[in-house]
Amino acid sequence: MRKSYKQFYKAPRRHIQVWEAANGPIPKGYYIDHIDGNPLNDALDNLRLALPKENSWNMKTPKSNTSGLKGLSWSKEREMWRGTVTAEGKQHNFRSRDLLEVVAWIYRTRRELHGQFARFR
């Protein structure tokens, strides 16, 4: 039987250290979000408190996305563009053959539902 186990210390990430040095401890249930989405930019004016759901709204577009815009997809069956925005557990959808109409709807709906955490790419 082993007498001791290796113990690893994981230091807080730098953006957390920067936030706590200026603002004190992070409230329970909150994350520190990078406003510009760049995890290397730890300037205090680029950091903000975010709930987990708000942090997920601000995620980058997945690499598997072929349309280039979050929430935009092409339906082969209906031959229409589809816009999808999710907030508070509810999925909001809009379909149209006009691409610009769907893109405008996505931008407008994200701004309305996600506020300052809206991210489009």
Curated annotation (Swiss-Prot):
InterPro entries: His-Me_finger_sf, HNH_nuc. SMART domains: HNHc. Disulfide bonds: none annotated. Pfam families: HNH_3. Coiled coil: none annotated. This is Protein 3.8. It comes from Escherichia phage T7. The lineage of its organism: Viruses, Duplodnaviria, Heunggongvirae, Uroviricota, Caudoviricetes.
